[in-house]
Every structure is written in structure tokens, then in C-alpha cells.
């Protein structure tokens, strides 16, 4: 089991991952306390017969049963894992094994990631387990499932212990050796930073803290401190694995919080061998889930996906089993857009869970009857072998969306996240232009897109701004929507003026505005929250979109944060206008109109073009398109809220593999 820059491989051949999570149908997460190889053999045989090609497993609870207080695993623990791996090997199933869940605090210490004593015991556990199985070729290690940085799970808040406080101050001293300058950045009196600098308080994470004398300008630094500290922990654990002689894959299993305000693959991705995302709740942003988790030059896997049960107020399920399966179909299909595939959570439903949204998750019920999800997974598994032979050398789309972490790691994060999501939908669903995402701290790995879009940034670090301007200088085209006149500490910058534009930022305090695109006028409307917090740009000549040469490239600058206007079509029209100006056309032509809720996303491979189509519409859609690269036509009916995949061979100029039609 290995990875290249984009996909998994087995024995050197691409693998389209269609897997599941499995512990035991009998005792679920207690399978190490109560191992039953007879049940494993039965269940893994069923998974194998379904055609699935990878399983994820590991420890989510009960670590005190697996090892002593120093982290040394018991011999029975290692023998249990050996039996599990032998059973998986019998059925040819690669295994991802998870060590910790949420916070690795089970081995004591004052801070799970920063306390040397705690980290040493974690290394003992990992080292002992990996040493025993370091040469198992079908095994990968997941360091921790859905990590949070502190005891305040699923948020980015300080733990508040002395070790964290000391590490925070050490980090600040290295990053900002001049306390007077740091005070200016944070807009506080210099004397307030004398001595030990406290961790941010809860009020500082509130956008209204400034009204009670507490500003939030330290939040960005705290989040960067947490990101870098966790990335260092991941590097330490990966190095611990490598010392054993293991060359097995290592990852971190993060959920959607990682691409929002928690520990992000944009930071820890370089510490592991592939990145992940767990697509659970962001059902309206399934594509964004994948694009944001994918890091430049590194494979990405949707490592958990499934259906959390949605309930009405009377505790009755909102979705039918068939509708749940349709949503899972869209998630699995979309996982092949710049991703390696998906692992479903969970094969057997876990009736021991205490929350009603989790109890029913799984393809096989406790009475061993199957949900429609199981049939769906079998269908994807049958398709995977015909897909994976084409998963080679994917080309990046010509458009990159650069995300602002300066805004995303502020107390106004929701605006930047919404700008990203709406930019993705406007480009791909409405303008029919595929794109990829690059986070601000990854800007040096941008590549060579023909167009970079900076959607409603409001703020950006000086380093990132210099990088995008350099991209333009070397011949690229940049589209900015709204101002970018602040840095990560919300300090004023005069970036438009520095580019030779007579312009300034001002508060966006109106509901209606117009954006002029040549002879066309696009109406924009901004809601209450946008009027309360956002800025717009004002050009002295009254124009609303400027086009200007810079170096060898060009900059298009719209004065409004268009992605955050109420009507999404406005952003799509702006994107199409700029793309047309620089001769970027959709990679397929529409032979018949498509509903706005239908995604058609092509990826050019070395020998083919991979088309993923997903419907968010309430009506069936007649897909009738022609691929521009091959001239091949694609025509079929896509059922409402379902997905389909087609592979068009470049030599054959026709569909050579398909799913869903």
C-alpha cells in the first residue's frame, strides 16, 4: 500500500478507494477487550464479497485496557492486532489503523500535545505497536481521529495549563521578538505585554469582545501557534514510526473542522503521507469539502463519510433510507474529484452509541439486514476496478481559488468560509469552470494557474499578498473581490494604492449595489451581517471593476465582496466575464440546458477525462454535453439527488467506464 501525489496504489497500481470502517459487528469499539476472530472472519468475508478494497479500524476507547500507565502495550493487545491483521490479509483488505481519538490525553500529562512526559508515553505505545508490525505491507497508521488541540473538543480554544502557557510565550518570542511591535499589532499598550503573555480568553473569540474592552487580534496568532504545535506533534510521531524501520503510510484522520477553524491539513499535511477529510455535516458543500482538504502535491482521502441521522422535532427521521443512500452516493462520487476515493463509516451499525444521530450509522443493521447504503457501496466497488486504471497524472484546472487564513482565523471566520464555499459553487455549478483551492500558508505551492481568484478576502498577510502579486508579475491573472486592505492583525494596508490605483476601503453599509461588467450591470444585495462587518473598496473614478496590467500579468479588481452578496449568480457572471476575457472556456459544451443544481466536474488524466456529475436538484436532469478535449458526447438522465461518473478515453473518444447510468 502506497501513495503518489494524487492517489493510493497497491503493488504500484492506482487504487480507487471504496472502503468501510470495521471493528466488530458483535461488540463494536470493544473489539480489543472482547476479540472474536470468528466474527471478524465472518464480517470481513462479507466486506470482501461486497468488493470493498480498504478498511479503517483502531482504538476509539479503552486505552487503559491496551497498555500500562507508561504506554507499553500488553502482549495480548499485540496478539489481538496480529489476529485482526491476519484476518484482513486473508481477504486482501488493506488496513488503516487509528491510535488515538479526539485528544491523546489517555496516557496522562498536563497537555496531550505539549507535555514531554505525555508525548513520551504516546511514543512508547506507537513505537511498540509499529515495531511489531513494521513490515506489514498492507498496513497504514492513523495517528489520531478528528483531533482537537485542547480539552475543549471540537473548538479551537486554549487548554489553559502551565505547559501550554509556556509554549505559547516561547512561540511568541520567536515570532515577535520586539514586544513593542507586537503590542502595536494587537492594538494594546506595550506595558500589558511585559512578562508572561496570557493565553486568549473566551471573550477574545467573540466578534463583540471589543465592545467590552477585549479585542480579538490575538486569536489569529493563537490559532497559528496551535496549528504549528500540532504539526510538530505529528512530525514527532511519524519520526517515531520511521525509527522502527517502518515505511508504512502515516496520516491524521481529521473531520470538516480541519478546513474551518481547527487543526488543518494545510499545516499538518506536510507531516504525514496523505491528507484526509471526514465529510459528515457539510452536505451543501460536499465539493468544497474535498477541494479544501486537498493539499498541493499530496494525496487526499475522504477517510470517513456517511449519514448522521437527521431527526424531526418528534424524533422521526427526516430522510428515508433511500434518500440517505442517495446522499452517500453524492459524497462517494465527489470524493474522486481531486481525491482518492472514500471510506464509509460504518459497515455495522453501532447500537451502543448514545446519540440518536449516530446510533443508526452504518450499512448493515444489528439484525444483519442491509440498508440501501450497502447496495450502493457494492455498486461503487464493482465500478472501482474500471476507474482506477485511469487514475494517473491528473491535470490541475486552470483556475485556483486562494483562501484567506487571515480572515478565516479571525472572529469573522464565517464570512471567509462562506466566501470560499460560494466561490466553489458559483464557479463549478453555475459558470461550469473547474477549479482547485490553495490555502494562504500554501501559497508558495500555488503552481501555474491561468487565473487566481481571491474571494472576498477582507484581510491577507503581507507574505501571501507579496506571493500573489509576484504570480501576477510573472504573467498570471488575478481577480480580487472586495478589499484586501488589512493584514492578519486587521492593521490597515494600502495595497490598492501601492499598485497605482486611486482607491480606499470603506464600510459596506448599504443593502443594494451594482457591479458593471462592460455594458452589463449586475445587481447585488447585502444582508444585515454583511452590512455590520464587511468593507468594500471605493475607486476614486467611481468604477466598480478595474482591469489593469501589472508586470507580465493582469489584475481584475471588483469593489464589492461579490461572493457574500445574496444572489450567487452575480459571482458566477463575474467569473465567466473574467474567464472569457482571458480565453478560459468551460471544458465541455452544453448541448442542452443544465439545472443550476447539477455539478459536472471534469478532470483530465493521462489517457482519459474523468467526469463526476452530482445532482443537488429536486428534478431529474438530462445530461447532454460534449467534452472539448475529445469531442465525445455524453448523454443520459441523472436522477434527482444522485450522482454518476464517466471516464472518456482520449484514444477511444468515447465512454470507457461508467457508474450510475
Predicted segments with their positions:
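A short, well-structured beta->alpha microelement
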Residues: 255-264, 425-445
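Active-site clefts of carbohydrate-active enzymes
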Residues: 105-109, 205-221, 291-327, 348-367, ...
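Catalytic-core region of carbohydrate-active enzymes that cleave or remodel glycosidic bonds
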Residues: 124-125, 234-249, 266-352, 369, ...
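A conserved amphipathic helix/loop scaffold
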Residues: 324, 456-661
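N-terminal carbohydrate-binding accessory modules
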Residues: 1-54, 68-71, 378, 389-390
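Aromatic-lined substrate-binding rim segments of carbohydrate-active enzymes
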Residues: 36-107, 116-121, 126-128, 234-244, ...
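Polysaccharide-binding and catalytic clefts of secreted carbohydrate-active enzymes
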Residues: 135-266, 271, 289
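Aromatic- and carboxylate-lined catalytic core of secreted/periplasmic carbohydrate-active enzymes
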Residues: 333-413, 421-434, 499, 503-528, ...
Amino acid at each position: 500500500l502506497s501513495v503518489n501525489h494524487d492517489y493510493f496504489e497497491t503493488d504500484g497500481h492506482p487504487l480507487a478507494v471504496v472502503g468501510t470502517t470495521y471493528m466488530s459487528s458483535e461488540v463494536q469499539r470493544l473489539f480489543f477487550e472482547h476479540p472474536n476472530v470468528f466474527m471478524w472472519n465472518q464480517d470481513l468475508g462479507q466486506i470482501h464479497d461486497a468488493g470493498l478494497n480498504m478498511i479503517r479500524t483502531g482504538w476509539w476507547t479503552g486505552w487503559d485496557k491496551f497498555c500500562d500507565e507508561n504506554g507499553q502495550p500488553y502482549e495480548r493487545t499485540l496478539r489481538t492486532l496480529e489476529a485482526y491483521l491476519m484476518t484482513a490479509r486473508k481477504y486482501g483488505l488493506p488496513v488503516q489503523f487509528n491510535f488515538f481519538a479526539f485528544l491523546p490525553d489517555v496516557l496522562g500529562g498536563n497537555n496531550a500535545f505539549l507535555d514531554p512526559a505525555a508525548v513520551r508515553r504516546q511514543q512508547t505505545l506507537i513505537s511498540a505497536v509499529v515495531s511489531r508490525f513494521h513490515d506489514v505491507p498492507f498496513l497504514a497508521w492513523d495517528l489520531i481521529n478528528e483531533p482537537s488541540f485542547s480539552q475543549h473538543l471540537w473548538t479551537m480554544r486554549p487548554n489553559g495549563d502551565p505547559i501550554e502557557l509556556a509554549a505559547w510565550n516561547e512561540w511568541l518570542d520567536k515570532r515577535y521578538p520586539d514586544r513593542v511591535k507586537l503590542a502595536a499589532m494587537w492594538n494594546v499598550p506595550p506595558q500589558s505585554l511585559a512578562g508572561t503573555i496570557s493565553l486568549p480568553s473566551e471573550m477574545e473569540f467573540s466578534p463583540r469582545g471589543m465592545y467590552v474592552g477585549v479585542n480579538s487580534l490575538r486569536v489569529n496568532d493563537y490559532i497559528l501557534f496551535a496549528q504549528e504545535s500540532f504539526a510538530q506533534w505529528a512530525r514527532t510521531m511519524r519520526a517515531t514510526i520511521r525509527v522502527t524501520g517502518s515505511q508504512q503510510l502515516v496520516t491524521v484522520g481529521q473531520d470538516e473542522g480541519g478546513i474551518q477553524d481547527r487543526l488543518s491539513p494545510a499545516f499538518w499535511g506536510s507531516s504525514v503521507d496523505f491528507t484526509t477529510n471526514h465529510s459528515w455535516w457539510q452536505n451543501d458543500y460536499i465539493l468544497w469539502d474535498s477541494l479544501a482538504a486537498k493539499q498541493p502535491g499530496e494525496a487526499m482521502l475522504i477517510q470517513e463519510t456517511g449519514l448522521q441521522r437527521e431527526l424531526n422535532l418528534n424524533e422521526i427521521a427526516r430522510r428515508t433510507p433511500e434518500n440517505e443512500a442517495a446522499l452517500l452516493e453524492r459524497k462517494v462520487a465527489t470524493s474522486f474529484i481531486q481525491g482518492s476515493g472514500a471510506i464509509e463509516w460504518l459497515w455495522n451499525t453501532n447500537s451502543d452509541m448514545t446519540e440518536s444521530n449516530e446510533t443508526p450509522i452504518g450499512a448493515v443493521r444489528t439484525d444483519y439486514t442491509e440498508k440501501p447504503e450497502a447496495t450502493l457501496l457494492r455498486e461503487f466497488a464493482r465500478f472501482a476496478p474500471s476507474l482506477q486504471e485511469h487514475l494517473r497524472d491528473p491535470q490541475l484546472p486552470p483556475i485556483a481559488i486562494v483562501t484567506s487564513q487571515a480572515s478565516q482565523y479571525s472572529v469573522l471566520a464565517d464570512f471567509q468560509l462562506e466566501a470560499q464555499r460560494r466561490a466553489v459553487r458559483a464557479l463549478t455549478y453555475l459558470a461550469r469552470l473547474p477549479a482547485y483551492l490553495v490555502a494562504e500558508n500554501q501559497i508558495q505551492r500555488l503552481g501555474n494557474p491561468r487565473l487566481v481568484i481571491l474571494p472576498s478576502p477582507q484581510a491577507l498577510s503581507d507574505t501571501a499578498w507579496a506571493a500573489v502579486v509576484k504570480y501576477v508579475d510573472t504573467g498570471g491573472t488575478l481577480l480580487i473581490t472586495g478589499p484586501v486592505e488589512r493584514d492578519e492583525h486587521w492593521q490597515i494596508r494600502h495595497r490598492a494604492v501601492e499598485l497605482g490605483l486611486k482607491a480606499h476601503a470603506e464600510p459596506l453599509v448599504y443593502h443594494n449595489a451594482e457591479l458593471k461588467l462592460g455594458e452589463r450591470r449586475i445587481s447585488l444585495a447585502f444582508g444585515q451581517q454583511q452590512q455590520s462587518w464587511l468593507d468594500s473598496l471605493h475607486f476614486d473614478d467611481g468604477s466598480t471593476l478595474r482591469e489593469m496590467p501589472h508586470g507580465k500579468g493582469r489584475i481584475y479588481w471588483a469593489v464589492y465582496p461579490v461572493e457574500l452578496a445574496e444572489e450567487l449568480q452575480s459571482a458566477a457572471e463575474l467569473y465567466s466575464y473574467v474567464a472569457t476575457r482571458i480565453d478560459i472556456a468551460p471544458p465541455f459544451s452544453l448541448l442542452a440546458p443544465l439545472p443550476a443544481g447539477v455539478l459536472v466536474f471534469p478532470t483530465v488524466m493521462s489517457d482519459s477525462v474523468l467526469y463526476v456529475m452530482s445532482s443537488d436538484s429536486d428534478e431529474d436532469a438530462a445530461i447532454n454535453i460534449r467534452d472539448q478535449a475529445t469531442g465525445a458526447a455524453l448523454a443520459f438522465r441523472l436522477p434527482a439527488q444522485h450522482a454518476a461518473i464517466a471516464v472518456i478515453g482520449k484514444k477511444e473518444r468515447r465512454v470507457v467506464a461508467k457508474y450510475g447510468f
